[in-house]
Amino acid sequence: MDSSDKSNLPLLLEIDWERHEAYTGENIFHVIAKKGWLKMLCALEGLVDEKIKPWLRKWSRDGNTCLHEAALRNKGPQAIRIMEKLIEYGADLNLKSSCHKPVLHVAVERNDYELVAWICQQPGINLEAEDFYKFTAHQLASKKNLNNDKKMVKILETYGAIPRQDGSSEDEVSDSEEKSDSE
């Protein structure tokens, strides 16, 4: 199926997606996000109802939401356009993968500066969300194994990410701030 052609939409809709998900662990939104099929996604607009919206928040067998798949398999403007549509339909940008990785962390790890800047500007985005290892996106960008990506750090700080020491959780930062205020 070509991403520029929505003539295959009827074929896509004929698939038994519940059976497909049971077999592959992916629903229609995971597949579309992975393949980068923006026109297919747009063609679904009138079909996404309250019954379908929970599919936008499901994890695939790999533990990713459709937004994680979009960030993993696409870059820059393509990822942004797909994610905009998925969010419009009801996907949640703050949902973490099954291994507790926020979508913002995926974009940081992939060095997708444009996507990171876009995510940081989204209403309600949690810039201080932590992954399984208690690292924020800012901490990931400033870690040595990511070559202390100064450009990424600057983007995150521009949009309000708070610099903190590696491994300190949000609560620890708040506690240390309270202690210094009371002294």
Curated annotation (Swiss-Prot):
UniProt cross-references to PROSITE patterns, sorted A to Z: ANK_REP_REGION (PS50297), ANK_REPEAT (PS50088)
A Pfam cross-reference name: Ank
One GO-annotated biological process of the protein: cellular response to tumor necrosis factor
GO function term, MF aspect, one: NF-kappaB binding
Key words, A-Z: ANK repeat, Host-virus interaction, Inhibition of host NF-kappa-B by virus, Repeat
ANK repeat spans: 62-95, 99-129
SUPFAM superfamilies with a match to the protein in the record: Ankyrin repeat
InterPro entries: Ankyrin_rpt, Ankyrin_rpt-contain_sf, NF-kappa-B_inhibitor
Keyword rRNA-binding: no
Region (Disordered) residue spans: 163-183
Similarity comment text for this entry: Belongs to the polydnaviridae I-Kappa-B like protein family.
Protein's job: Suppresses the host immune response through NF-kappa-B inactivation. Possesses ankyrin repeat domains required for NF-kappa-B binding but lacks the regulatory regions required for dissociation from NF-kappa-B and degradation. Therefore, prevents host NF-kappa-B release and subsequent activation.
Descriptive protein name: I-kappa-B like protein N2
Native source organism of the sequence: Microplitis demolitor bracovirus (isolate Webb) (MdBV)
